[in-house]
Swiss-Prot record:
Family statement: Belongs to the RecA family.
Function summary: Can catalyze the hydrolysis of ATP in the presence of single-stranded DNA, the ATP-dependent uptake of single-stranded DNA by duplex DNA, and the ATP-dependent hybridization of homologous single-stranded DNAs. It interacts with LexA causing its activation and leading to its autocatalytic cleavage.
Protein name, UniProt field: Protein RecA
Alphabetical list of PROSITE patterns matching this protein: RECA_1, RECA_2, RECA_3
Gene Ontology molecular functions: ATP binding; ATP hydrolysis activity; ATP-dependent DNA damage sensor activity; damaged DNA binding; single-stranded DNA binding
Binding residues for ATP: G79, P80, E81, S82, S83, G84, K85, T86
Chain's gene name: recA
Compartments (UniProt record): Cytoplasm
One record GO biological process: SOS response
Species this chain originates from: Borrelia turicatae (strain 91E135)
Length: 363
């Protein structure tokens, strides 16, 4: 018994000695590098959860896992042409502005449509815009904005359009291998550390290219080298899966797109969701709420009919979406309840909800 006690005492003394040694090291580190250079994770902002920016779709917020795009992180959104990449970023800018935040758009492609941005809810009078001439200029502007600490969201459109100065100065036929990859690698090394301190979210839109000579596996790859893949905390792949038609088959009013979380450092990856994007309107909030409400049994689907309890919303998906567009009070109530279920762990069984004009008080 005494031997066991001696072992415990020795272990405690060893623990105390190691803690004293770490404390002395911490004092020296703070003396050399400044206060807060070494702290316990529980005392730092890192250990207090991840702040996020809503994507504008409750389905995408759930797929990402933290209620939206994580702040202080690098995000890459990539996919084929006309798949909805820019729409996702403009919708995020709209959400930032709704909550009183500040957003910036670095338009390296020189192709931002202010009319479309305004239609998606972006306040173009308050949106900071830069149309740089070179890739170096674009990334330095992004760095300045991050260091300012005043910007909540920066969108870079796109990585493929970040042309290095040497490429612009050279001849059209010059072979300059790896210039853009080296540019991206250096820029990302510089901004990663300051991003977490400023809580700025930076989103890079990227394009797909085909690898030459690939016989097996996926021949697609993104531009700008591998650095962005490594530094990104979140990578979203966006692909168009079908067209959304109106009153006739020839009346195309939008696209249905699939968003896959290819990489996620803040929640489990590889989740897939489908979004409806209407031309000139953006992501259909009501369609996302309808799908999420069916998933969590706030809305019932029997055959082609959609209902809440005994009260019918409409026959067919489009009719139910139109009903939710008209009944904004109900739609807002559904979204609030869904966020409590998804992000706060509230049981769907504890919720009673119904259309405003027919809702019955629970006895």
């Amino acid at each position: 018994m005494s031997k066991l006690k001696d072992k415990i005492d020795d272990s405690l003394n060893d623990r105390l000695n190691r803690e004293k040694a770490i404390e002395l090291a911490r004092i020296q580190i703070e003396k050399d590098f400044g206060k807060g250079s070494l702290i316990k994770m529980g005392e730092s902002p890192v250990g207090k959860g991840i702040e996020s920016i809503s994507s504008g779709s409750i389905l995408l917020d759930e797929a990402i896992g933290v209620g939206g795009y994580p702040r202080g992180r690098i995000i890459e959104i990539f996919g084929p042409e006309s798949s909805g990449k820019t729409t996702l970023t403009l919708q995020a800018i709209s959400e930032v502005q709704k909550n009183g935040g500040i957003a910036a758009f670095i338009d390296a492609e020189h192709a931002l449509d202010p009319v479309y941005a305004k239609a998606l809810g972006v306040n173009i009078d308050e949106l900071w815009l830069s149309q740089p001439d070179t890739g170096e200029q674009a990334l330095e502007i992004a760095e300045y904005l991050i260091r300012s600490g005043g910007v909540d969201l920066i969108v870079v459109d796109s990585v493929a359009a970040l042309t290095p100065q040497a490429e612009i100065d050279g001849e059209m036929g010059d072979c300059q291998i790896g210039l853009q990859a080296r540019l991206m690698s250096k820029a990302l090394r510089k901004i990663t550390g300051i991003l977490s301190k400023s809580k700025t979210c930076i989103m890079f839109i990227n394009q797909l290219r085909m690898k030459i000579g690939v016989m097996f596996g996926n021949p697609e790859t993104t531009t700008g080298g591998n650095a962005l893949k490594f530094y990104s905390s979140l990578r979203l792949e966006v692909r168009k899966i079908e067209q959304v038609t109106g009153s006739s088959a020839d009346d195309v009013v939008g696209n249905k797109v699939r968003v896959k979380v290819v990489k996620n450092k803040v929640a489990p990856p590889f989740r897939k969701i489908e979004l409806v994007i209407y031309f000139g309107k953006g992501i259909s909030r009501e369609a996302s709420i309808l799908d999420a409400s069916i998933k969590y049994k706030l809305i019932q689907k029997i055959g082609s009919w959609y209902s809440i309890g005994d009260d019918k919303l409409g026959q067919g998906r489009e009719s139910a979406i139109i009903y939710l567009i008209k009944e904004k009070e109900l739609t807002n109530e559904l979204e609030i309840k869904l966020r409590k279920i998804i992000f706060e762990g509230l049981s769907p069984d504890s919720i009673e909800i119904g259309p405003p004009n027919v809702k019955k008080d629970k006895e």
